[in-house]
Amino acid sequence: MNTSTLPKSFSFKLGSAHNMEKKLFEVLEELEQAAHRDEIKQALREHREETRQHAMNIEQCFALLGEDIDDSPCPVVEAMTKEGKATIKKTDDSLVDAIVLVAATESEHYEIAVYETLITNAHARGATQVAELLQQNLDQDKHALEVARSTMNTIAEQGIAATNA
């Protein structure tokens, strides 16, 4: 796609975000299967359903813009997925939950950056309804990041306590 205009560039990035959400929907299931702790599995399962809605919100954004869904690639998520899978394979089983949370945290940071940029550009285009849908996605991703951080801190504290015991 030629992205020589701001609207075309926005559509490209919106399409990339759509592919990001579709890929993360798959990845979250894999992370859930890799995780050991029930609270991590549950959080990943819940966010997976939110991720499904994120993709549908983006589809609705394209409809509001009167455009077909742009099928732009999202190489960042592809690379993060490869890295996460390789790291999980090489990690001692007792540390897998921590690695799963690291992967979740990294992807949430990326998603937050994507949505913040898209929202700014949607407002610049005067596409208020589009910005509102993207804001819903952003809010859920910020919450997912907080859940991952909190759980990661709990695991770290438990690990330190076990080491000091």
Predicted regions and their residues:
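Amphipathic alpha-helical hairpins
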Residues: 1-165
